[in-house]
Swiss-Prot record:
Chain intervals with Basic and acidic residues compositional bias: 243-254, 421-430, 439-455, 468-481
Protein name per the record: Postreplication repair E3 ubiquitin-protein ligase RAD18
Gene this protein is translated from: RAD18
Zinc finger feature spans (UBZ4-type): 187-215
Taxonomic lineage from the root: Eukaryota, Fungi, Dikarya, Ascomycota, Saccharomycotina
Zinc finger (RING-type): 28-66
Entry keywords, A to Z: DNA damage, DNA repair, DNA-binding, Isopeptide bond, Metal-binding, Nucleus, Phosphoprotein, Transferase, Ubl conjugation, Ubl conjugation pathway, Zinc, Zinc-finger
Alphabetized SUPFAM superfamilies for the sequence: RING/U-box
Localisation per UniProt entry: Nucleus
Subunit structure: Homodimer. Interacts with E2 UBC2, forming a complex with ubiquitin ligase activity. The UBC2-RAD18 complex interacts itself with the UBC13-MMS2 ubiquitin ligase complex through direct interactions of both RAD18 and UBC13 with RAD5. Also interacts with UBC9. Binds single strand DNA.
Enzyme Commission number(s) of this protein: 2.3.2.27
Length: 487
């Protein structure tokens, strides 16, 4: 069902405009909508659970009386919750029943009935009724028009306002009612079902039916009979008997709300999420906390803190205050929707050494292609080949730096092994170390010169392909497995 925006002023045009106050009292002072999961503050005011928790994050006081209190002092109001749900379910029907109907304008050409143009009931005359009563006692009402009324004499027409005689009033009786209420028929009470039946019907059929049903363990059939003059007790009891319609508890909304309130209790299945002081936590600890709850760890430190704080409000409002909590998947869906609209990561964040800074640095001179690649950077349509061509020089430089680090690590490990030998071995290791240092200096000079030459070109080499870059990566992998220092 679609959610419709309603206001308390809808009742001002009804026959009971004072219901405007009731409708206003059942609304939250913060969101102006009907209370959802209402909670009670220590100062006695009621708000939506999520609304007041969000307000307390900014200002630790009541929005109405400014009384200061903590979030842990909020208490659930199950009764108010069911009252509001019951009221909202019948609000539209109540409005329809209380709306004052607008007077419909009467057309000018339409005649308004007056005393001279009132409706008439035509009754048959005494001579005609004698012949009709022999066959049927039913009342004959004949629809008459103005032409037929003109032909008839006024003595044969009786106005509706006139009082009929005893003989005419007797004509209103139905023949079916006469058959069922014969005054001379003797009635008797069944000793099994305690119901009154005609004596002949009781002796012939009813007693056998009651005895048969009683032997089978079934309840006897109770048939309704018309009261007769021979059974005054039955007549008086049926006159004052009031039919009370049975209430279907499954279809009546009020009954279900009452049952939910009577069976309400605090659920111990989910524990309350605590407030966390993030000032003493590192960024890795914050990520670990979010990962334990199944939340995203993207964004800056401040983004992750805001994400946890909002999820804590959703969790406690749902599992600690609501009678009908939703599952965790729905809470995470609500968090994702909030994260997209309220917790955006700034595009111009300068993370030192990060991929965003590198992408901005390399976008000079090729901004159009860079922006085109950046549009699909985080989905399956990302052009990897174009990305490798754009940043080919950086990949090559990183590969060379990795090779140099592998050489440095292998020389350090061989030097530590050589220290365990005698003095000659130490001198040999030191000479080898000096040779390696000289070689590293030469390699670094070579890398610097290559970077300088590549910077002067300012364009990637068109002859190199993705296969060349892949071969360099494979060579680096083999080089890391079997470095030259191990030979």
């Amino acid at each position: 069902m679609d959610h419709q925006i309603t206001t308390a002023s809808d009742f001002t045009t009804t026959s009971i405009p004072s219901l405007y106050q009731l409708d206003t009292l059942l609304r939250c002072h913060i969101c102006k909508d009907f209370l959802k999961v209402p909670v009670l503050t220590p100062c006695g005011h009621t708000f939506c659970s999520l609304c007041i928790r969000t307000h307390l994050n900014n200002q630790p006081n009541c929005p109405l009386c400014l009384f200061e209190f903590r979030e842990s002092l909020l208490r659930s109001e199950f009764l108010v919750s069911e009252i509001i749900q019951s009221y909202t379910s019948l609000r539209s029907s109540l409005l329809d029943a209380l709306r004052i109907p607008k007077p419909t304008p009467v057309p000018e050409n339409e005649e308004v009935p007056g005393p001279e143009n009132s409706s008439w009931i035509e009754l048959i005359s005494e001579s005609e009724s004698d012949s009709v009563n022999a066959a049927d006692d039913d009342l004959q009402i004949v629809a008459t028009s103005e032409r037929k009324l003109a032909k008839r004499s006024m003595t044969d027409i009786l106005p509706l306002s006139s009082k009929p005689s005893k003989r005419n009033f007797a004509m209103f009786r139905s023949e079916r009612i006469k058959k069922k209420s014969k005054p001379n028929e003797q009635m008797a009470q069944c000793p099994i079902c305690q119901q009154f039946y005609p004596l002949k019907a009781l002796e012939k059929t009813h007693l056998d039916e009651c005895l048969t049903l009683q032997s089978l363990g079934k309840k006897p059939k109770i048939s309704t009979t018309f009261p007769t003059e021979s059974n005054p007790h039955n007549k008086s009891s049926s006159r004052f008997k009031v039919r009370t319609p049975e209430v279907d508890k499954s279809s009546c909304g009020e009954t279900s709300h009452v049952d939910k309130y009577l069976n309400s209790m605090m659920s111990a299945e989910h524990q309350r999420l605590p407030k966390i002081n993030f000032t003493s936590m590192t960024q890795s600890q914050i990520k670990q906390k979010l990962s334990s709850l199944g939340l995203s760890t993207n964004g800056t430190r401040q983004n992750m803190i805001k994400r946890y704080n909002h999820y804590e409000m959703l969790w406690n409002s749902n599992f600690c205050d609501s009678l009908e909590p939703v599952d965790e998947a729905e809470l995470k869906r609500q968090l994702l929707s909030w994260d997209v609209s309220h917790n955006k990561t700034p595009q111009n964040s300068s993370n030192k050494g990060g991929i965003s800074k590198l992408m901005i640095m390399k976008s000079n001179g090729k901004s159009s292609s860079y922006r085109k690649l950046l549009e699909n950077f985080k989905n399956d349509k990302f052009n990897r080949k174009g990305w490798m061509v754009m940043f080919r020089k950086d990949f090559a430089r990183l590969i060379r730096e990795a090779k140099m680090k592998i050489k440095t690590g292998s020389s350090d490990s061989s030097g530590s092994v050589g220290h365990s030998n005698d003095g000659d071995g130490v001198e040999k290791v030191q000479s080898d170390q000096g040779t390696e240092d000289q070689q590293m200096e030469k390699d670094q000079d070579t890398v610097i010169n290559e970077d300088r030459v590549a910077g002067e070109r300012n364009l990637p080499n068109e002859d190199s392909t993705d296969a060349d870059l892949s071969r360099e990566l494979m060579d680096l992998n083999e080089y890391s497995k079997d470095p030259p220092g191990n030979n």
